Design a protein with these regions (language model features):
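Intracellular loop-helix junctions on the cytosolic face of multi-pass helical membrane proteins
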Residues: 1-15, 130-140, 154, 168-350, ...
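Helix-loop boundary and gating motifs at the non-cytosolic
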Residues: 4-87, 270-280, 342-347, 351-365, ...
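Intracellular juxtamembrane helix-capping segments at the cytosolic ends
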Residues: 39, 153-167, 448-462
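Loop-to-transmembrane helix entry/capping segments in MFS-fold secondary transporters
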Residues: 74, 169-178, 373-377, 463-473
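Helix-to-loop junctions at the C-terminal end of transmembrane segments
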Residues: 89-107, 390-407, 492-493
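C-terminal ends and interior cores of transmembrane alpha-helices
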Residues: 103, 114-136, 413-430
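C-terminal transmembrane helical hairpin of 12-TM major facilitator-type secondary transporters
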Residues: 406-453
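A late C-terminal transmembrane helix in Major Facilitator Superfamily
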Residues: 460-494
Length: 540
């Protein structure tokens, strides 16, 4: 790809699309933080060991604070955190957004119609949550929160698809930086800001006042209106004819059926193995129990058979036909990249592993080092947010200027190497100057890496299935880092912070190797295509 001038790179931020993505990013960050309750505060206050691996950075979890202040049991608050699964599995219903246009609202276009529906549900849901007192209407509050979570996840899908369709690959980083800026500002406002508002309206840990939380949630619901207005004003991205034809391939009933079959499959497979593990096969092998007696007496064996039948039903020819709307985008990705898809999926699954695993224990590390909460809030939260946004902006600028792969490599290298700064900080105690330096470089590299990675993911998707493929790839991006992050506390307890930060830095090496391999392959591909293009131009 030919390099562009700095003026052309800066021009990427001057387009109206960047302002649109800024407002849409604000709309995406607002409901996520207001609804997605975490357990970090509960676990830390209850004295649970660090092996729980919960990110202390989500201490400003608004819904959990509200529920706890209202006197709701910790166990119930813990179950309420499962609402966040809507964001993890949003790829399940993403084909609906690719292949079905809503009635009535469909006149706005495929992307805008889904955005209007999702944003309207979020606004009404947040206001409705505000009028539900957890002390009296807890079930209603949780039910509405579930609706808001699914609507918010649907909004995320539509925004990502819209972003992919309005700009070229090299411009995606600038749009991603703008989106990230709006998202992070909304996240800060919806967490710390919401708590300040609730306390300002008269609700504290010592004197719960429902009307204060009503005012807070109604206010934040109304703050979604500018995003809804933006959706109504902005233009629908152009849809190629081939995409329109593919959208009509599956009917709405078939698409709903595919979502149902996929959910059954996702539930049945792990449940099948769990019940087989719990079945008492030893009684048959060593005690002479018949299989019929085992079936009649062991409920786990009966459930295992049931889940096995459901799994095979989903994988049968009829089940695969039902899954076609979901499998088609996946098959398209595999057919386009073939064996290379393994390398790409490995790169995607590990790119954010180094900084994500480290980030799980970062704020707990600050406390254990002896930093005050004011220092953590000022340096890590506020100053760190500024450096992250600066890094994202610089990343978008550099990608337009130099291309995606060089900046993707630099982002991966700096994200892993800055973990060494935490290693040095671990030997220095509560050194504020070193903390500022560490946070500056770490968040700057994180922002740069994020913008580069979003641009790279965007370049891998097919516009026919932009919503589905991007939702799936972004889920893969988070899966392995979050799983490993769950054991970060165990590593710290066993090996200490010094070795923990060294290990997280080394986790970035496989990713860098895969980036180099993919980068070299793209260079070879570009060299082989140049003579073909020159030959086609010379032909009369």
């Amino acid at each position: 790809m030919p390099r562009k001038t700095w003026r052309a790179a800066l021009a990427a931020y001057a387009s109206p699309s960047t302002l649109v993505l800024l407002l849409l990013g604000f709309a995406a960050g607002m409901p996520y933080m207001l609804v997605f309750s975490t357990l970090s505060v509960w676990l830390r206050e209850a004295g649970v060991a660090r092996a729980a691996g919960m990110p202390y950075m989500l201490v400003f979890s608004t819904l959990s604070v509200w529920l706890r202040e209202a006197g709701v049991a910790r166990e119930t608050i813990g179950y309420a955190s499962l609402i966040g699964l809507a964001y993890a599995f949003k790829w399940v219903w993403s084909p609906l957004l690719d292949q079905w246009r809503l009635p009535l609202l469909g006149k706005l276009g495929r992307r805008r119609s889904w955005l209007v529906l999702a944003q309207s549900l979020v606004i009404l849901g947040l206001i409705g949550m505000g009028f539900c007192d957890p002390q009296k209407h807890l079930s209603w509050l949780i039910a509405i929160a579930v609706v808001v979570a699914f609507a918010s996840a649907t909004q995320d899908i539509a925004i990502d698809a819209y972003r992919l369709e309005i700009a070229q690959d090299t411009q995606q980083a600038a749009l991603a930086a703008s989106y990230m800026s709006g998202y992070r500002v909304a996240a800060l406002l919806a967490t710390a800001g919401a708590l300040y508002f609730a306390e300002g309206f008269g609700s504290t840990g010592f004197a719960y006042k429902h009307s204060a939380w009503t005012g807070t949630y109604v206010l934040f619901g109304l703050l979604m209106l500018p995003a809804l207005a933006t959706t109504l004003i902005m233009r629908e991205p152009p849809v190629p004819l081939r995409t329109q034809l593919s959208a009509a391939r599956y009917g709405f009933t078939h698409q709903l059926a595919s979502v149902f079959v996929l959910i059954v499959l996702l539930v049945s497979v792990p449940a099948m193995f769990t019940q087989l593990y719990n079945t008492d096969f030893a009684s048959v092998l060593f005690n002479g129990t018949s299989w019929m007696d085992l079936l009649l007496e062991d409920r786990a064996f009966l459930r295992a058979i049931l889940y096995t039948l459901l799994t095979f039903a989903c994988l049968s020819s009829m089940g695969r036909r039902g899954l076609a709307p979901v499998l088609t985008p996946i098959n398209d990705f595999i057919m386009r990249y073939r064996w290379q898809a393994l390398l790409l999926l490995g790169l995607i699954a590990t790119y954010r592993m180094s900084d994500t695993v480290m980030g799980v224990m970062a704020n707990v590390f600050y406390i254990d080092q002896g930093f005050t909460k004011d220092q953590i809030a000022s340096v890590s939260k506020i100053f760190g947010l500024i450096m992250t946004l600066l890094g994202a902006g610089v990343g978008g600028l550099l990608i337009v200027r130099f291309g995606i792969m060089p900046i993707l490599f630099i982002g991966g290298l700096t994200s892993a190497s800055t973990n060494i700064l935490f290693l040095l900080l671990a030997d220095m105690g509560p050194n504020v100057k070193m903390l500022i330096l560490t946070i500056s470089l770490d968040n700057l590299s994180s922002g740069l890496a994020t913008s580069a990675f979003v641009a790279y993911l965007s370049s891998l998707t097919n516009l026919k299935f932009s919503a589905t493929q991007y939702a799936l790839l972004s889920s893969i991006m988070l899966l392995l880092p979050r799983l490993l992050g769950g054991y970060s506390g165990v590593v710290v307890e066993k090996f200490g912070y010094h070795n923990f930060f060294l290990i997280t830095a080394l986790l970035g090496i496989p990713t860098l190797v895969m980036i180099i391999l993919q980068w070299n392959r793209e260079i070879r591909t570009a060299k082989t295509e140049e003579p073909k293009q020159a030959t086609s131009i010379d032909q009369p």
